[in-house]
Amino acid sequence: TFSEQGVRWPFPWDMHAKFTRFVSSGNPQSIFFDVMFLDHKEHEKEFAEAIHDSGNVFLDFPFETEEVHVKYSDIDERMEILNQYRFPVDPDDTKMPWVEEAVPPTPMLARAAEGIGYANIKPDVTDKVNRQLPLIIKYRGFYYPSIDLVIVMHYYGITQDDVEIQIGKYVKLKNIPPEKMAKPSSDRTITIPIDDEGFMDINFIGGPGSFQSYSYYYFAREGKYKHKSLENKICLVAAYSSTGISTDIHPSPYGQLFGIEHHANALNTILNQDFIIKLTPLQNVLIMLVLALLMGILLPRFSIVFSVIFAVVLGLLYVIGSYILFDTMNFICAFTTPIIQIGGTFSFILAYRVLTEQQEKKYIRQTFSKFVSKSVVDELLKDPKMLQLGGQKKILTVLFSDIRSFTSLSETMPPEELVEHLNEY
């Protein structure tokens, strides 16, 4: 429809102004533009007025990981506005920042907005999959909040004084109205777990299209939005298309997702208090120790075939148990290492059993072949427990053979020759 009118991405700012006015008439809780408004453009004043009149528009910006070659003449003014949102650094935080430079929105738009925050996403360095979101970023001796945290603070109606940050542990939101909490508590706080770089784990609810989306074109009009579908909702606006206009796409545990979907999942995680709880390294080590002890005690008592079955079943039970813990309680256990440990422990015990059984059979063969026939030795090798002292009651047929003149014969032969002679019988 836009293409029919000759409108191409990025859309002109007067269209964003029209969109903002129309959506605001539907009384949404927040409007978040995941669109970078970094350069001054035509209709900036009109767009700023629409943002200001709405009173609930949030804009994002990038924290660059390298030095920015494009210099903005008003960067000091931009940073002055951005600094209104910063938090003091935790005294125990000694880590170096991983960002180089901030590029906030234009001052006119930033002042008109209800809040601004960065929109950075940083995939895992090992497999390039994004499972986390930097809730706070350390920059020039302060913590700066992500756009998601800024929106959440607005949703709960709290200020910077109601936020407590302890790096490597949590971001705590305090004095929250109970009626706005998904899981109300007496202390009226929400504790968001973070790592030592300020990253929170995103509890993704699914793959592409998990959140309801609408065409921008429908809302970019004059007039009033008369339906209730936007009322008290957080509306996220971004280039969200399979036609190639959006390059903001990142891998997730559920496949490729647009950047705005990562933010939607992060907001959903916080607002529903569905935080992922990772077991500590010590807890994971204890789990692996229990698995190793269980296998060490039971496997030597089983046959090799039953040992294989037991190891496979134990591995499957661990996988199923880990899934149930995550699905019901949001607990994440170490996954790959315990499975490898089960296989490694089984292989070690199996190798040990094979070696010891071979040594035992070799000892039995060498010892008893001097005294009994080969067939008797073979029977002993089938079941070495037959060597133990004690009687057994069995119905047997016995053949007695008497060697004539054995006494006089034995007196004339050395022991070695006598045994060899007896073995012929």
Please give the residue ranges for each predicted region.
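Non-transmembrane functional regions of envelope-associated proteins
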Residues: 1-189, 227-306
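Catalytic NTP-binding/metal-coordinating core of nucleotidyl cyclase/transferase enzymes
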Residues: 388-425
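Transmembrane alpha-helices and their extracellular/periplasmic helix-loop junctions
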Residues: 269-371, 375
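Generic alpha-helical secondary structure signal
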Residues: 258, 262-266, 289, 375, ...
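Cytosolic juxtamembrane regulatory segments of multi-pass membrane proteins
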Residues: 370-389
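Substrate-access "cap/lid" subdomains that shape
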Residues: 165-166, 170-225
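Short aromatic/basic micro-patch
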Residues: 103, 371, 400
